[in-house]
């Protein structure tokens, strides 16, 4: 008695003629029971375009596991047929029902098997729309496969076109989306695509859609203003009245223009007649390369920020030192300086922080010992100490937090500057245990830490931190 199996391989580890597996090849083949799967099933479920399928006759006493565990058992089998997937004639003798043909075509699309697709695309049972949806959704499918499918059926219903175009845009298959739109120029599809292109900052696609009749609105233009894309904005404004844009969305427009951080964008819309006032400082992108020149334009127009605003706080931690120098000259109130100093130190912009201190910011403005506003890290603590931060007010709080969170380098520099900590015994036990486990692997088994007093634990922690 005997039975039939299929062997599937996709590489050079297996010799289909002699049924021999090279070293390491055992894990690169599949052995399929023919009673469970037909040949076409094996192809669709297990094969790639580069695969081959060997139909073998196997003695009844051999199982699949025995064949995989000991490749020498394959010598007891007989090759009945070999099917190479890259040989198009393999499929000629197959009986392909409607559902099977559909599955095979999906397999061909996913494997970029262009010749096989061409063989069957004229079949009346093939739905090009379904194959396109399958191909577009799979990032491994090449554009030339999708273009082939489109060449067989260019025209779709409006809802079908919208679905395919949306899929293309989500998968960033822009050229295929353009082709679909050119063949199926439904106004609703074009307009919805422009919504997507604008929100996704796809300038090239947006221009294509405008050229193909898309209706432009304020939101489309605002999207490209926000990213500083002046070319696309000007192109759209050739088809949309500038004054209408200014009148319809003045507040959103001013915010978008200044948030773009683009000098050219700001100058362009000021020249168009956009009205501006001191509120533009709230929207300005302070980390832009153009910020310095933008501020000079505002100064030339005698537009200044309010002295009690958050402008300095919002800008100081991200702007260049040159921009900061201009802002400081606006004479903000003391609270603005102090809040800006906190945000700048916490952001690690220490040069800017030094300039704020030089200009009048107070590093000790917060005299509440239970509320330190600064982040705990070594560079920040060092900066505070170097600039006469009052450790008597906040030092103990910062040291406690440093120890409890394992910031031992911060704790060390604070201890070196005379700061004492104030913690409960349970907190001291946790700190000591964590330190020992981190730096020594374990606590000395001969030491009963629970029997130690708080003072004894403090001394041990001091010694460990200083000698770390």
UniProtKB/Swiss-Prot annotation:
InterPro entries: Ankyrin_rpt-contain_sf. The lineage of its organism: Viruses, Varidnaviria, Bamfordvirae, Nucleocytoviricota, Megaviricetes. Keywords: ANK repeat, Repeat. It comes from the Viruses. This is Putative ankyrin repeat protein R580. ANK repeats lie at residues 12-41, 189-218, 249-278, 336-365, 367-393, 394-423. It comes from Acanthamoeba polyphaga mimivirus (APMV). Coiled coil: none annotated.
């Amino acid at each position: 008695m005997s039975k039939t199996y299929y062997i599937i391989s996709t590489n050079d580890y297996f010799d289909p003629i002699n049924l021999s597996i090279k070293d390491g090849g055992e894990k690169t083949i599949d052995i399929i029971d023919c009673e469970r799967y037909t040949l076409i099933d094996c192809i669709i479920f297990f094969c790639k375009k580069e695969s081959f399928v060997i139909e073998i006759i196997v003695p009844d006493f051999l199982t699949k596991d025995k064949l995989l565990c000991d490749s020498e058992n394959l010598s007891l089998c007989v090759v009945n047929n070999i099917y190479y997937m890259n040989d198009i004639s393999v499929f000629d003798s197959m009986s392909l029902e409607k559902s099977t043909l559909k599955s095979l075509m999906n397999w061909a699309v996913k494997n970029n098997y262009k010749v096989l697709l061409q063989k069957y695309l004229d079949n009346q049972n093939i739905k090009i729309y379904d194959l396109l949806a399958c191909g577009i959704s799979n990032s491994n499918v090449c554009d030339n496969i999708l273009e082939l499918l489109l060449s067989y059926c260019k025209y779709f219903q409006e809802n079908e076109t919208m679905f395919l175009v949306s899929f293309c845009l989500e998968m960033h298959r822009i050229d295929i989306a353009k082709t679909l739109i050119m063949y199926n120029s439904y106004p609703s599809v074009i307009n919805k695509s422009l919504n997507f292109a604008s929100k996704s900052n796809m300038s090239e696609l947006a221009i294509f859609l405008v050229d193909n009749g898309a209706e432009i609105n304020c939101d489309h233009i605002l999207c490209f203003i926000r990213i500083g894309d002046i070319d696309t904005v000007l192109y759209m404004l050739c088809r949309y009245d500038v004054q209408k844009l200014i009148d319809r969305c003045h507040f959103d427009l001013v915010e978008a223009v200044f948030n773009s951080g683009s000098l050219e964008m700001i100058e362009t819309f000021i020249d168009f007649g956009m009205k501006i006032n001191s509120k533009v400082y709230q929207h300005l992108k302070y980390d832009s390369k153009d910020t310095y020149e933008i501020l000079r334009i505002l100064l030339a127009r005698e537009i200044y920020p309010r002295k009690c605003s958050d402008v300095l706080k919002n800008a100081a931690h991200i702007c260049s030192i040159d921009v900061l120098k201009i802002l400081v000259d606006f004479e903000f109130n003391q609270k603005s300086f102090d809040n800006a100093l906190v945000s700048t130190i916490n952001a690690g912009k220490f040069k800017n922080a030094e300039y704020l201190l030089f200009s009048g910011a107070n590093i000790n403005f917060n005299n509440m010992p239970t509320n330190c506003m600064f982040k705990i890290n070594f560079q920040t603590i060092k900066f505070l100490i170097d600039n006469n931060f009052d450790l008597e007010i906040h030092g103990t709080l910062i040291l406690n937090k440093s120890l409890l969170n394992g910031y031992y380098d911060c704790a060390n520099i604070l201890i070196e500057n005379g700061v004492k900590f104030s913690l409960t015994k349970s907190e001291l036990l946790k700190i000591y245990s964590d330190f020992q486990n981190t730096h020594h692997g374990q606590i000395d088994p001969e030491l009963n830490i629970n029997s130690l007093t708080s003072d004894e634990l403090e001394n041990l922690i001091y010694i460990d931190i200083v000698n770390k």
